[in-house]
Amino acid sequence: MAQAKINAKANEGRFCRSSSMADRSSRLLESLDQLELRVEALREAATAVEQEKEILLEMIHSIQNSQDMRQISDGEREELNLTANRLMGRTLTVEVSVETIRNPQQQESLKHATRIIDEVVNKFLDDLGNAKSHLMSLYSACSSEVPHGPVDQKFQSIVIGCALEDQKKIKRRLETLLRNIENSDKAIKLLEHSKGAGSKTLQQNAESRFN
């Protein structure tokens, strides 16, 4: 009888310890789950800051190279450029880096995709029209929407092999490049229009002198 009581107490002790360990494990797992959510929120916030930095730099650069900037006095342009350079310098002081975890295959896919985009960018000066068409086909390969033009199937398969975060960055880079080309086209057209209007005015003035 005494031995049975001793065994019962021993079993009770083991049950208490086991129950206590399970509770601790559950609490620790719950804490880690909550921390995982905060880690992902931190990465998302840092990525948002990265994107905001890119957008700000692009906007400052766009203002500096705008047609409006060319149509003001030298003194005003110099003053505005000083302000723009100051803002650009302050923006560049913000350093945010979100590293993407990649396996070897994803790393190789990213290098391949980056190399293809760089090759197109290097052709800008030689043939802007062709480069723009090529970029649009690359962008269509990254878009989940129904493409409005041709899709570079080879590039699409390469991008699919990249990490999800890298896929988003590739798409953003292509969007930025296409916007820059669009802005350049507009600036050239405005410049040609202003030159054409100026030539027409000069011609009219010359004709009026002879009449």
Curated annotation (Swiss-Prot):
GO terms for biological process: negative regulation of protein ubiquitination; positive regulation of proteasomal protein catabolic process; positive regulation of protein processing; protein folding; protein metabolic process; protein stabilization. InterPro entries: BAG2, BAG_domain. Keywords: Acetylation, Chaperone, Coiled coil, Phosphoprotein. The lineage of its organism: Eukaryota, Metazoa, Chordata, Craniata, Vertebrata. Residues 20-61 form a coiled coil. Residues 109-189 form the BAG domain. The modification N-acetylalanine is found at residue 2. Co-chaperone for HSP70 and HSC70 chaperone proteins. Acts as a nucleotide-exchange factor (NEF) promoting the release of ADP from the HSP70 and HSC70 proteins thereby triggering client/substrate protein release. This is BAG family molecular chaperone regulator 2. GO terms for cellular component: axon; cytosol; dendrite; dendritic microtubule; protein folding chaperone complex. PROSITE patterns: BAG.
